[in-house]
Amino acid sequence: MAIQPPGSYPQGNKKGKAKKKSGQNAFARKEWYTLRSPSIFPNNINGKTLMTKSAGKNSYMNMIGRRYDVNQADLTGNNDVGHRKFIFKIGDIKGSECVGFFDGMELTSDKHKAMIKKWHTLIEAQKDIVAKDGSVFRVFVMGVTRRHPGYVKKTCYVKHSDEKKIRKIMFDVIEEELSGCDVQKIMKKLANETVGKRIEELGSEIFPLQNCCVRKVKTIKSHQTASVGQQEAIDAITN
């Protein structure tokens, strides 16, 4: 058997062999798109997102359906509402602008946990509502009992019968305030906490309540289009 010269033997362990780095920049094939939320908010430009360049004619369609969330304090400039964030889904693209449609709302985890109190009763309810355009949203609300003046007991629990009455009020308020409204009006009511204030007002007639609010809104079925609730934002881009 002939002896091969040094360096001609096959590499036994290729894991430790360093790969040659190419000089190509990873961001050279990326495109930047601006994220734009609905026009009802004062600050409706919410940053940028990346997409890899493609040779396809409709390569921008890869962006459709991408979800992102924005804190309400960034949307309105008011830090007092920084405990709430809105979720948007990219539904239309005009040039380098991505128009986001409403896709849900949620409280921040620290705010949600801070509202739940020991020795109190937590009352929760959820109900599906149908918007004007046929979109279906599932609304989650909550409320916590409150000690009224002169209350001396350590615990502040509500009777089960009164809890059922308060939950019935929650269902009725969700139906009255949100059902049948267009999506923009729903977003305004969520931003102003109209539902939570109404629940606290009516429910306190049965038992004192506090921290009543819409905890979460989840999209079940969306029929939003560029002509429903978003035309103003698109016109602002094209003009």
From Swiss-Prot:
Localisation: Cytoplasm
UniProt subunit comment: Component of the small ribosomal subunit. Mature ribosomes consist of a small (40S) and a large (60S) subunit. The 40S subunit contains about 33 different proteins and 1 molecule of RNA (18S). The 60S subunit contains about 49 different proteins and 3 molecules of RNA (25S, 5.8S and 5S).
GO biological process: translation
Name of the protein in question: Small ribosomal subunit protein eS1
Gene name of this polypeptide: RPS1
Major localisation: cytoplasm
GO cellular component: cytosolic small ribosomal subunit
Single annotated GO MF: structural constituent of ribosome
Organism: Encephalitozoon cuniculi (strain GB-M1) (Microsporidian parasite)
Record has Cytoplasm as a keyword: yes
Superkingdom, taxonomy of origin: Eukaryota
